[in-house]
Amino acid sequence: MQSVDSMLGTVGGCGGGEAASTFSKDPSGCCVGNDCRDGGRGLERRHGRWSRGEGGESGLCSGGQMASEIEYWDGLAISVMEVEKAFGSTNVLWKTEPFSLWACTAACPPSLSPTLLALGLPRDGKELAEQGSLWTVLEPGGDWSHSQSQLGTPGRGKGALGF
């Protein structure tokens, strides 16, 4: 199967900890800079991948202030508003390393589940944990340096898409 990274690009949240070492922040706590447009509310695409400076992640805020739609390089789009409606401030997507898998932290919205299933991905954290994968989730408003999952191994996964 084609790697999820190559299909979707790399997406990450702008929280604290590790992210703070790469980016300055505006008063709202969002990352700012050349790779983080509109105070972290937008996205910049570089060479077919979302980019966030040295970290290679995207410029997203963890407080719910972001683009209304995330459009991946292959044309796949996920409505952030729809996800927020379904999950509130819950972080929905996360990435495991080195496995390059994406999944939802809870049951995915109906419009997202078919996409994950088509990519051969788990639909929720429990399913992924049962597979023995290492993963990290960025809690709502959380700090990247304190985001390791109780079910995973600290320090091995990163890259939550935070709402």
Curated annotation (Swiss-Prot):
It comes from the Eukaryota. Residues 154-163 have a biased composition (Gly residues). Residues 144-163 are annotated as: Disordered. This is Putative uncharacterized protein encoded by LINC00696. It comes from Homo sapiens. The gene is LINC00696.
